[in-house]
Amino acid sequence: MRNFSFVEPTFQARQTQLAICQSIYDANAFNIQNWKYGFKTNPDMLPETVIAFLDLLTELKVDYCIVGGIAYLAYIQDRNTKDLDILISVKELNKIVEFVEVTNKDVNFTNADFNGLKIDFLKTSNAIFKYVKQHETTTYEFAEGVYPIATIKGLILMRFDAIIDLHQKGNFTKVVYYERDLQVLTLNYEIDWEHIWKISEGFFTNGQIKEFKKMVADWQKPRRNRFA
């Protein structure tokens, strides 16, 4: 049964230690869709499954980096996330692929299931993923232990890449979520945008960078009380 203390989202820089188990448990256990259509896995088992997977990565000496929602939550006390996103090379992925059930894959991603835990592997065959893995990683002390995660700059670059892809697919609802994540990071952290724009030149077109600059400039404008 759930034995985590409730952590209220503040949508600000994180002040409390993040527990991966709690975030993934809460996102699955309290997902209204699961209550409506049925749970595909017992959420009470997810915490120990998360620990087992992280221990497996350590045991096999896998070189990886946590990205996506869990990495974002390490910086911002926000909504929970129901899966685990892992940045990894194909060589390192081959060390653990026999321990998971692959559900889908393409050149950039491999989606898998580990005893009910959903895992998305983001492969460094993608140029921007490779850059983040090599240059924009750090460590974070989760409740479960110290693990590698993407830096804020790394998360921003990956969100930029995802936003472009989502626009091309017409998935504008998810675009809104990703843009909001970037806005919250911008409002809570001092970010070296000039460095990000410089790095972006190697991955995005001038037109794409121009649009991202407009977005960031809008987020940086002083806020006023519209209802005063």
Predicted regions and their residues:
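Compositionally biased terminal segments of proteins
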Residues: 2-228
